[in-house]
A protein has these predicted regions:
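A late C-terminal transmembrane helix in Major Facilitator Superfamily
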Residues: 123-158
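Hydrophobic core of transmembrane alpha-helices in multi-pass small-molecule transporters
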Residues: 14, 97-111
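Cytoplasmic membrane-interface "Motif A"-like loop-to-helix N-cap segments
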Residues: 66-77
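Intracellular juxtamembrane helix-capping segments at the cytosolic ends
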Residues: 111-124
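Extracytoplasmic gate region of multi-pass secondary transporters
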Residues: 4-60, 147
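Multi-pass alpha-helical transporter architecture, strongest
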Residues: 169-201
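Interfacial helix-cap and linker-helix signal at transmembrane-aqueous boundaries
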Residues: 32-33, 63-64, 151-159
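C-terminal ends and interior cores of transmembrane alpha-helices
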Residues: 79-92
Length: 201
């Protein structure tokens, strides 16, 4: 728990849960209905996200073995944030805009999991990856719970979901910056050369 990398991973995964299961999984259908989109149509778009999610997560797993996982997460959270910022306008444009959102957001939905698991293993070792990712995964569920309740409370207070979706988009952009700091040691310069080599090994 003293590890900065743990809190960066847990914090970014908290935002992942907040912006997916808690927000979109819970509130997309009611938000769509408020914009005149039938419930069955909105549910169908949410189901279509699951199909694109399968594709996106599979490709993400392949990429996580070949690319810098921090940069992958930066792209994923950045694109998710931009998608959420676009969502209020997609809802206003009715079906076509929401369909475009479903494609891009669906591809990104669980794409964050493979690089997060890989970074957890690289940071804490394969012997500890199970328990460490368990705690990081718990933060994901906590984020989902916060968003499920918080988005509903904001909707009841403000009368619509626009502020909620825009705020979640901005939070995802913050996460895109945070994940780039995973694995960076601020104390490297203060360590003697021999000690630094032992830490890096």
């Amino acid at each position: 728990l003293r590890s900065r990398d743990f809190w960066l991973l847990a914090g970014s995964f908290f935002i992942c849960g907040l912006s997916t299961n808690g927000l979109i999984g819970t509130h997309l259908i009611p938000a769509s209905m408020e914009h005149g989109i039938p419930e069955v149509t909105a549910a169908g778009l949410l189901a279509a996200m699951g199909v694109f999610d399968l594709v996106g997560t599979t490709v993400s797993g392949w990429l996580s073995d070949r690319w810098d996982n921090r940069r992958l997460l930066c792209w994923y959270y950045g694109l998710r944030g931009l998608s959420l910022l676009f969502l209020p306008y997609a809802l206003d444009s009715r079906f076509l805009g929401l369909a475009a959102f479903a494609v891009f957001y669906g591809l990104d939905w669980i794409a964050t999991v493979p690089p997060t698991v890989r970074l957890t293993a690289d940071t804490f070792g394969r012997e500890k990856v199970g328990i460490m990712f368990g705690w990081i995964g718990a933060s994901h569920q906590l984020g989902a719970a916060v968003a499920a309740f918080g988005a509903g409370a904001l909707r009841a207070s403000l009368g619509d979901y626009q502020v909620t979706f825009m705020s979640a988009g901005l939070v995802c952009l913050v996460a895109a910056g945070l994940v780039l700091r995973i694995g960076q040691r601020s104390s490297d310069r203060a360590l003697p050369a021999g000690r630094l080599e032992s830490v890096e090994s």
